[in-house]
Swiss-Prot record:
GO terms for biological process: tRNA thio-modification. It is found in: Cytoplasm. It catalyses: cytidine(32) in tRNA + S-sulfanyl-L-cysteinyl-[cysteine desulfurase] + AH2 + ATP = 2-thiocytidine(32) in tRNA + L-cysteinyl-[cysteine desulfurase] + A + AMP + diphosphate + H(+). The keyword Cell membrane does not apply. HAMAP family: TtcA (MF_01850). This is tRNA-cytidine(32) 2-sulfurtransferase. NCBIfam families: PRK10696.1 (NF007972).
Length: 312
């Protein structure tokens, strides 16, 4: 190996380590900010075979070695009996990394196909069926937390989906309790960018399994929102970061929901807690979010160069 090749190899290793540290830091911060994992927890990581859930499992396993609390991990995959689903991939992968796992076999694919007319969106029914099965499995395994692989971009997409199509100011919470009060669901990737997860999944060479059930629905409303946000991100760098910051800084007195703020009892001469005066827009110019050029990064995996360059 020449001196130039050695230098390039070191740079690529450095870039991968930087990416991994960034993901670990973001996951660690989310866990701490929302008290997602506590001492003695058994965390059930829902593994679909996609880039997000693989990354979630990998980072949690990595963090567990240095975490200030002890927690166990069990990976769970729901085999929905989709035609052509490669049943061997996840058991082989999970066995190779030595993690406890369970494969749950339920023919939700057949139910969805039976109930949903051809050409209609299957996501709503599919997600409800999956949720019920995963909650039941968590109880059977004695899991105290259910970890899902939704990331920052998913949360913003959900925000706009609810605004545009549902008339609600609502996103995905980083932590929630199930309707029956028996399960706690956490999203440790809440602070992670999808671009970082994509790069990490390729660099780690996870055996990705595509979802053929919903992948054949190109006109999904979520896909429309995703493309809109991606366009904004390319044209206006920093906008996504600013929007995510917005859902962490809510001012109920400047919205229109009387359930969140007592507008009826506002009196002259009073400045109740939570009121920020008569300024609707805080500044003429939004504060600039520092933008780090993370779009071009080269990694080495098993001696092979993996190059990432985002195309605008």
């Amino acid at each position: 190996m020449t001196e130039l090749e050695t230098k390039e190899n070191k740079k690529q290793i450095y870039n991968f380590n930087k990416l991994q540290k960034r993901l670990r830091r973001n996951v660690g911060n989310a866990i701490a900010d929302f008290n997602m994992i506590e001492d003695g927890d058994k965390v059930m990581v829902c593994l679909s075979g996609g880039k997000d859930s693989y990354t979630l499992l990998d980072i949690l396993l990595n963090l567990r070695h240095n975490a200030p609390v002890h927690f166990d991990i069990v990976a769970v995959n729901l085999d929905q009996k989709q035609p052509g689903f490669p049943e061997h991939i996840l058991p082989e992968y999970l066995s190779s990394i030595g993690v406890e796992y369970k494969i749950v076999e339920e023919n939700t694919y057949g139910i969805v196909k039976e109930k949903i007319p051809e050409g209609k969106t299957t996501c709503s029914l599919c997600s409800r069926l999956r949720r019920g099965i995963l909650y039941r499995t968590a109880t059977e395994l004695g899991a105290t937390k259910i970890a899902l692989g939704h990331h920052r971009d998913d949360m913003l997409e959900t925000l706009f989906l609810n605004m545009f199509y549902g008339g609600k100011l609502k996103s995905m919470p980083p932590k929630l309790v199930s309707d029956d009060g028996k399960q706690i669901v956490i999203r440790p990737l809440a602070y992670c960018k999808e671009k970082d997860i994509e790069k990490y999944a390729v660099a780690k060479q996870f055996p990705i399994i595509p979802c053929n059930l919903c992948g054949s629905q190109p006109n999904l409303q979520r896909q429309v929102i995703k493309e809109m946000l991606q366009t904004w991100d390319r044209r206006y760098p920093g906008r996504i970061e600013t929007m995510f910051s917005a859902i962490q800084n809510i001012t109920p007195s400047h919205l229109c929901d009387p359930n969140l703020f007592d507008f009826k009892n506002i009196k002259r001469g009073q400045l109740p807690k939570g009121v920020e005066g008569d300024i609707a827009f805080d500044k003429e110019e939004l504060p600039q979010t520092p933008i780090i050029d993370e779009d071009t990064e080269d990694f080495v995996n098993n001696g092979q160069l993996i190059r990432f360059k985002e195309v605008n």
